[in-house]
């Protein structure tokens, strides 16, 4: 018998489940050099993609991680909600 795949991909650490997400977000673009007004007008934030597990979230931020063991988390990020597409 083939086990049906779960609708949601998750892991369990301790007694808590962490769900896997694709997070699309805007990264700040900075440039310390001299530039014309046209070059400045053409600057845009980079659209980034992060794949990982959601550790927690609130109204201001989302915490994520991509690597883990039985007790610790690594490849961690904290995204301000306003940066997430």
Language model: regions and residue ranges:
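Conserved RNA-binding domains used in RNP assembly and mRNA/RNA metabolism
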Residues: 2-85
């Amino acid at each position: 018998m083939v086990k049906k795949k779960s609708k949601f991909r998750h892991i369990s650490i301790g007694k808590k489940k962490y769900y896997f997400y694709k997070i699309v977000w805007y990264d700040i673009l900075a440039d310390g050099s001299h530039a014309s007004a046209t070059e400045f007008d053409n600057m845009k934030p980079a659209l980034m993609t992060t794949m990982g597990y959601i550790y927690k979230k609130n109204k201001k931020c989302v915490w994520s991680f991509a690597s883990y063991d039985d007790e610790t988390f690594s490849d961690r990020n904290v995204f301000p909600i306003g940066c997430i597409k």
